[in-house]
């Protein structure tokens, strides 16, 4: 399966990622390995990955791949509308009397004259993340949830709940958590962030 996928991927220009932690020896799950962040190109778009190497017992002084995880970072020809590609906003301010940003947003949310291209079920972290990513690619996405308010999937849990993993691995695209947030985020703080994220993105 990997060989078949690799043929279609056409990975080229594989190199150590410049703006990540340099290769180092680490302990991962009681396995000592060399860990390296990589970046490369594919025929679909730019990609990144993490490679973990362990000693090869069959070949002295050589290593073999223990873990290889990759992520497609973009799609060539369908770049995200961020940074230099972001919208200017000029079309909202130059013509007085026409619809402004809020008018257009409310019309788009009503779906009275069109259907969404994508329907996402669940306004939790994954649902909001995919909707934000698709939105930045210009793909009309509607998110629905069984709860009345975005964030209620956390808000309605037990009173003392905080996230069980650290803030550093829970960031959402385009709007990372503020740097002064606690390492373990309380449920209501996270719920309110989800609600603000949905409105902003």
Describe each PLM feature range.
Residues 101-112, 172-179:
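Short glycine/proline-rich turn/loop motifs
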Residues 155-192:
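Glycine-rich active-site loop/strand segments that organize a redox cofactor
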Residues 1-30:
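A solvent-exposed, acidic/Ser-Thr-rich amphipathic alpha-helical stretch
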Residues 73, 126, 148-149:
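Short, solvent-exposed loop/turn segments at secondary-structure junctions
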């Amino acid at each position: 399966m990997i060989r078949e996928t690799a043929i279609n991927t056409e990975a080229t220009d594989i190199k150590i990622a410049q703006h990540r932690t340099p290769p180092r020896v680490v302990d991962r799950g009681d396995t000592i390995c060399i860990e390296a962040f990589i970046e490369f190109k594919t025929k679909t778009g730019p990609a990144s990955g993490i490679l973990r190497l362990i000693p090869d017992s069959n070949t002295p002084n050589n290593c073999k791949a223990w873990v290889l995880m990759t992520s497609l970072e973009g799609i060539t020809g369908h770049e995200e509308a961020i940074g230099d590609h972001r919208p200017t906003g000029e079309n909202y301010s130059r013509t007085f009397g026409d619809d402004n940003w809020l008018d257009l947003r409310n019309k788009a949310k009503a779906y009275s004259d069109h259907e969404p291209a994508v329907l996402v079920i669940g306004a939790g972290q994954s649902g909001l993340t995919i909707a934000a990513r698709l939105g930045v690619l210009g793909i009309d996405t509607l998110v629905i949830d069984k709860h009345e308010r975005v964030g209620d999937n956390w808000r309605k849990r037990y009173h003392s709940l905080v996230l069980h993993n650290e803030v550093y691995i829970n960031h959402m695209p385009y709007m990372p958590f503020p740097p002064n947030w606690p390492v373990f985020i309380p449920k209501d703080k996270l719920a309110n962030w989800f609600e603000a994220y949905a409105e902003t993105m």
